[in-house]
């Protein structure tokens, strides 16, 4: 019997999210790799949930980070209420989109935690 790849497919340019230990990685879908049930994404931001409210705290701008190919099953659709505040933070006129060493390390740690 042949295993069928996952049927999870996201639309190109759609914003998706991976949730892990109260941290959220938001990314833009570049393409679906259906043969291996993976998703090619462009990281946008890393955020953390606030236990006292439903709001997310913006942590790192990841727009200049390396693109990722990860299992599609890790992702979920990002909610408008999550994305809109982050987008306004990312594209604020006074904000530079420089990938800092701390942001790069945070992304690396987040991805490493997924595979532990």
Kindly give the residue locations of the regions a language model identified.
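Membrane-targeting and insertion segments and their boundary/processing signals
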Residues: 1-4, 77
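Short, solvent-exposed secondary-structure boundary/capping segments
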Residues: 36-44
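Intrinsically disordered, low-complexity, charged/polar segments
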Residues: 47-116
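Short coil-to-beta transition motif at edge beta-strands of beta-rich domains
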Residues: 3-21
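A broadly conserved detector of short glycine/acidic/proline-rich loop/turn motifs that flank catalytic sites
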Residues: 22, 45
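Short beta-strand-centered aromatic/proline hotspots
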Residues: 23-34
